[in-house]
């Protein structure tokens, strides 16, 4: 007995037994999930009802297998117990993140609960025991990049395309862009009647000439789903420049490919596609190639991608200006600093010129999103600057409220806080968009990973992550890379598991029939149509199309009369809207296809 205890206490053997025990236990917990007798795992009753005998059997099998591996000569030096602990930790946290999402929805509670456990497992296996990948895996960097791209495309392109076929894409913003691209294809320009319920150029709301870069592809495949796929391709393509930027900082091929995998699993990039096509989807690709050009000191590509970024949207100038300012104040070459001054000046001039255009010829910039920082009589930019210098405490008190703190964990916490740690002060300038665009606004969607406002600022966060990682020791960089990879996977599953629901449709026959019915309307070319929000995208060919903005008391502005009115029977305001339009003398028209009639109510004068 004493000999056994002495052996167990020995640092090497005792650690191996403990790692083996934890690995077998975690794997067993995963395997009993399908056999649980009650529906909820995150419930106190689960402990009493769990299949205990099955847990013991699985544990014994896994522990025996891991022990047997130690007797295989070729595996003795591969630290199989360390590898088992790291793999089982990743599998357990990811699997339980999925269960947590299904039972309680989006939450960071589970992530906060396991983040220390993940960190300890990574430190002990990668840091202390310096576990390494087998030699053959170092040649698999292309496979890592390819798998990351495929994985990301499934969620950013395919899952979003399926939303259309489930009648889950609303008028705002997908219906707007579906009609706009059809009009652009027909040579009418970026005209839409959906955005404000009257004929209007979308560029009067947001100045986005970069949309014309998508037009040739839309003309080849003129359908709303094309836009969803294009968005996914734009966002996913950022995987390539991320890899190249990491290589510039001296990381190996396989290590650089892991940065691409982190990009693919980073919740904000996939989440930003959640609500369909938006001009901001071009930001990751353009900004990352701009950053690559900066790192390689390539003048022409730097200027080209700076220009392309500016053309995405009026506020995209913020990202270009911040990059330029960072380059000016950095310790880079004189050439790079000079180019930084050029793009900084160009971005500032462009921003003020476009803002002047929108204020004078368009609907104005959306300064109301910063209303909490605008004092009486102050303009947007001057108010923010003056408040920052005279009352910084007020701004700081608004940066980390409940939702914003959650957002910070989802974007910076999964990267181990590395973007916040650097000896070079100039790099902190790159966090300005994260604060200005995401944390300061009162508009709730700007600090949510499920909306497009995260694309630009999070690209700069990824850049900071790579740069700051390059300053760490080799072993620490390995630890933080593995930690971030697992943390991003856990957060991804904690927030994006619901995307799988896009691939299942219990009413696919009815939805398909409705979409076919809507896409062939109108019966006469000159007829106008008013419809509920989820019917708008399939009506993309309609030139005079209006959306019903549900109100308790509909008006001609919120629900414009038209030659044809299409009401969604699933809508909570169906009765209100039906009574409103019938009071205007409209009557219900019989729809012969019962599958369509059960969802669509058609009214005509």
What are these regions (language model features)?
Residues 1-26, 60-156, 339-343:
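Start-transfer (signal-anchor) and selected internal transmembrane alpha helices
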Residues 62-73, 225-250, 289:
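Transmembrane-helix motifs of polytopic, lipid-linked glycan transferases
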Residues 108-117, 318, 428-474:
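Hydrophobic/aromatic-rich transmembrane helices and adjacent perimembrane loops
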Residues 79-80, 236-268, 284-285, 300-301, ...:
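Transmembrane-helix signature of polytopic, membrane-embedded enzymes
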Residues 80-92, 144-150, 344-348, 471-496:
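Signature aromatic-anchored transmembrane alpha helix within multi-pass, membrane-resident enzymes
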Residues 176-201, 209:
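Extracytosolic helix-loop segments that constitute the early lumenal/periplasmic catalytic or substrate-binding loops
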Residues 63-74, 394, 405-435:
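Hydrophobic, aromatic-rich transmembrane alpha-helices
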Residues 249-250, 279-282, 288-302, 328-334:
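Membrane-interface transmembrane helices that cradle and orient dolichyl/undecaprenyl
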């Amino acid at each position: 007995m004493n000999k056994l205890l002495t052996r167990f206490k020995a640092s090497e053997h005792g650690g191996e037994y403990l790692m083996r025990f934890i690995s077998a236990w975690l794997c067993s917990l995963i395997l009993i999930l399908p056999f649980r007798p009650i529906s909820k795992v995150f419930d106190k009753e689960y402990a009493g009802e769990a299949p205990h005998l099955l847990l013991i059997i699985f544990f014994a099998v896994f522990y025996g297998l891991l022990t047997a591996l130690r007797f295989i000569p070729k595996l003795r030096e591969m630290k199989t117990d360390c590898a088992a602990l790291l793999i089982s930790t990743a599998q357990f946290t990811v699997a339980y993140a999925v269960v947590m999402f299904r039972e309680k929805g989006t939450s960071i509670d589970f992530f906060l609960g396991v983040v220390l456990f993940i960190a300890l497992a990574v430190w002990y296996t990668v840091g202390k025991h310096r576990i390494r990948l087998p030699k053959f895996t170092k040649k698999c960097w292309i496979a890592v990049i390819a798998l990351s791209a495929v994985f990301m495309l499934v969620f950013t392109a395919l899952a979003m395309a399926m939303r259309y076929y489930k009648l889950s894409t609303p008028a705002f913003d997908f219906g707007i862009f579906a009609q706009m691209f059809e009009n652009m294809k027909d040579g009418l320009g970026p005209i839409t009647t959906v955005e404000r319920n009257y004929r209007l150029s979308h560029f009067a709301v947001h100045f986005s000439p970069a949309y014309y870069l998508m037009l040739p592809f839309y003309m080849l495949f003129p359908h709303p789903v094309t836009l969803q796929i294009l968005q996914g391709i734009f966002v996913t393509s950022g995987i390539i420049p991320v890899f190249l930027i990491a290589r510039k900082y001296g990381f190996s091929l396989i290590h650089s490919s892991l940065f691409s995998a982190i990009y693919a699993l980073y919740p904000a990039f996939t989440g930003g596609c959640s609500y369909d096509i938006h001009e901001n989807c071009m930001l990751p690709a353009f900004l990352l190639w701009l950053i690559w050009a900066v790192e390689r000191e390539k003048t022409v590509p730097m200027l080209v991608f700076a220009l392309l970024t500016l053309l995405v949207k009026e506020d995209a100038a913020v990202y270009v200006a911040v990059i330029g300012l960072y380059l000016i104040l950095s310790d880079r070459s004189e050439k790079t600093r000079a180019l930084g001054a050029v793009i900084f000046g160009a971005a500032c001039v462009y921003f003020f010129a476009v803002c002047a255009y929108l204020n004078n010829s368009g609907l104005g910039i959306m300064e109301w999103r910063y209303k909490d920082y605008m004092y009486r009589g102050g303009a947007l930019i001057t108010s923010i600057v003056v408040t920052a210098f005279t009352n910084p405490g007020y701004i700081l008190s608004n940066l980390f409220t409940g939702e914003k703190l959650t957002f910070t964990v989802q974007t910076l916490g999964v990267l181990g806080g590395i973007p916040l740690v650097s000896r070079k002060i100039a790099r902190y300038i790159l966090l300005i968009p994260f604060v200005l665009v995401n944390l300061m606004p009162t508009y709730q969607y700007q600090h949510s990973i499920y909306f497009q406002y995260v694309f630009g600022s999070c690209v700069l966060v990824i850049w900071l992550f790579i740069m700051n990682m390059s300053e760490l020791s080799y072993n620490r960089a390995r630890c933080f890379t593995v930690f971030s990879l697992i943390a991003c996977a856990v957060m991804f599953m904690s927030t994006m598991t619901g995307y799988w629901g896009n691939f299942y449709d219990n009413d696919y026959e009815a939805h398909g029939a409705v979409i076919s019915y809507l896409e062939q309307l109108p019966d006469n070319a000159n007829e106008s149509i008013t419809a509920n929000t989820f019917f708008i995208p399939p009506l993309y060919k309609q030139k005079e199309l209006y959306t019903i903005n549900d109100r308790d008391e509909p008006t001609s502005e919120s629900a414009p009369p038209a030659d044809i009115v299409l009401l969604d029977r699933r809508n909570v305001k169906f009765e209100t809207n039906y009574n409103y339009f019938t009071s205007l003398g409209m009557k219900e028209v019989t729809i012969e296809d019962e599958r369509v009639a059960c969802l669509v109510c058609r009214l005509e004068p």
